[in-house]
Amino acid sequence: MAKLTKRARLIREKVEATKSYDINEAVALLKELATAKFVESVDVAVNLGVDPRKSDQNVRGATVLPHGTGREVRVAVFTQGANADAAKEAGAELVGMDELAAQVKAGEMNFDVVIASPDAMRVVGQLGQILGPRGLMPNPKTGTVTPNVAEAVKNAKAGQVRYRNDKNGIIHTTIGKVDFEPVQLKENLDALLGALIKAKPAAAKGVFVKKVSISTTMGAGVAVDQSTLNPTA
């Protein structure tokens, strides 16, 4: 039997696999167990009561976290004219149309988020096979295809997270960094859960938010007692 690492032993000692922790206790555990040599992200997994095989029960969208994610986000915007000027003013690193598409085709993708105005989708549509597998394809449901590109850029820079349930009906995203204050992580999680509840499909029946777990980049998941959370709309 393989030897457990020091961190794995610590996790096994500290985290009860069958217990749901008060959010403050869960965050304290994550901070105690975060021993990596870099500032780890705090990730969340939310098990939803949906049937992901049915298109009318899939959950997808985006929300701005009140305290951001702690990440520097580089934004590329496909647009032109006055919208291009507005996107640059809002802080977008890359703005253009055909010339920006050529960069993407050449493999130059130094960005984390792609936004497009509706008139630019004729150009962006040609990049689906490149952007799609990377989760970068703009979509109206996540607010990344919009006539108001400046607002979309500001949202991305302010810590907007995009979410989409996987084939098991689970949402995976980040709610900050392990060096955030506990109250910041709680408020970010509350905001995310509020957005998910608001996005509940009409076809979804029964308990919608079934389980919430938080973890650090290198750590194990800690189940959170939902009664200690306060989802915000």
From Swiss-Prot:
GO cellular component terms listed in the entry, alphabetical order: cytosolic large ribosomal subunit
Coiled-coil regions, chain positions: none
Keywords recorded for this protein, A-Z: Repressor, Ribonucleoprotein, Ribosomal protein, RNA-binding, rRNA-binding, Translation regulation, tRNA-binding
Recorded GO MF terms: rRNA binding; structural constituent of ribosome; tRNA binding
A Gene Ontology BP annotation from the UniProt entry: translation
InterPro entries reported for this sequence: Ribosom_uL1_bac-type, Ribosomal_uL1, Ribosomal_uL1-like, Ribosomal_uL1/biogenesis, Ribosomal_uL1_3-a/b-sand, Ribosomal_uL1_CS
UniProt key word Repeat: no
Job description of the protein: Binds directly to 23S rRNA. The L1 stalk is quite mobile in the ribosome, and is involved in E site tRNA release.
Quaternary structure note: Part of the 50S ribosomal subunit.
Family to which this protein belongs: Belongs to the universal ribosomal protein uL1 family.
Protein's UniProt name: Large ribosomal subunit protein uL1
